[in-house]
Amino acid sequence: MKRKFVGAAIGGALAVAGAPVALSAVGFTGAGIAAGSIAAKMMSAAAIANGGGIAAGGLVATLQSVGVLGLSTITNIILVAVGTATGARAEGSMGASREQESGPQDPPQELQEPQEPPSCKKQDLNLGKFVGAAIGGALAVAGAPIALSAVGFTGAGIAAGSIAAKMMSAAAIANGGGIAAGGLVATLQSVGILGLSTSTNIILGAVGAATGATAAGAMGACREQEPGLQDLQQEPKEPQEPQELQKQQEPQEPQELQKQQETQETQETQELQKTQEPPSYEK
């Protein structure tokens, strides 16, 4: 449960902070559309399709306005809701524990076969980023109605006893019994019933794609193989017999020194034999 709260907080923060990052990455910056960027190509294609102009309220105009002026408070609230739901779900699935089986347990880690180190190829990391971007974008767009429905803004209206009902009650008390048009509760209620607009879905998809690609890149970072693992992967050497080990440990004398010792021993033997011979008595 604690991990879900942490994941929800991180997801909400990344959703709000990731929107300007994602828009700036494709070229919708605070100073305008960056030359040679994806945004510039989108603007060129939209101008050709509209006979030389950019349609007001269209995709390019909306993203350009968001890049220059930033997101509205309502859009940020929706992003927080989507990021919170997505982060909590991701953290809950990653932190789910496996129940311990009642049968025989697995052997210790030292006795298991050493696994190959993770692949550090650049192609694998790029593929992981593309997959993470696709999953993040899909989750962001699909998670908006789920997040709104979870707090009580459903397609049939505000659910009784939900967080949305408490928000509506507080707003009604603050406004003297009515709900202000264009306010937070009215906007979320409208989104819950009618759904998000195309431009908002595009922004959500961009934020989710940027967040998913960043997460996939961080999770796919390779760790270098530790030097001790190579020693563990080598086959153990057979123990040597004591006699062979003793032979290896005995120092071998040089051949010249051995010849000198043999010559010296021969001379000493000859001198000893001469001294031991009995004297001869000749007549």
From Swiss-Prot:
The protein's matches in Pfam families, at most eight in alphabetical order, are given as:
Ifi-6-16
Disulphide linkage map: none
Task: Quote the Gene3D superfamilies the UniProt record gives.
Answer: 6.10.110.10
- From the record, give the transmembrane residue ranges: 130-150, 176-196, 202-222
Q: How does this chain sit within the bilayer?
A: Multi-pass membrane protein
Where found in the cell?
Mitochondrion inner membrane
Please give the residue ranges the record annotates as the region Disordered.
Answer: 90-120, 227-283
Its GO CC terms are:
mitochondrial inner membrane
Q: How does it assemble?
A: Homooligomer. Interacts with BAK1. Interacts with BAX. Interacts with adenine nucleotide translocase.
Query: Does the keyword section mention Signal?
Result: no
The name under which this protein is listed is Interferon alpha-inducible protein 27-like protein 2B
* Its biological purpose: Functions in the intrinsic apoptotic signaling pathway and may have an interferon-induced antiviral activity.
Which biological process terms from the Gene Ontology are attached to this UniProt entry? defense response to virus; innate immune response; intrinsic apoptotic signaling pathway
Family listed: Belongs to the IFI6/IFI27 family.
Source lineage: Eukaryota, Metazoa, Chordata, Craniata, Vertebrata
Cite the entry's keywords alphabetically. Answer: Antiviral defense, Apoptosis, Immunity, Innate immunity, Membrane, Mitochondrion, Mitochondrion inner membrane, Transit peptide, Transmembrane, Transmembrane helix
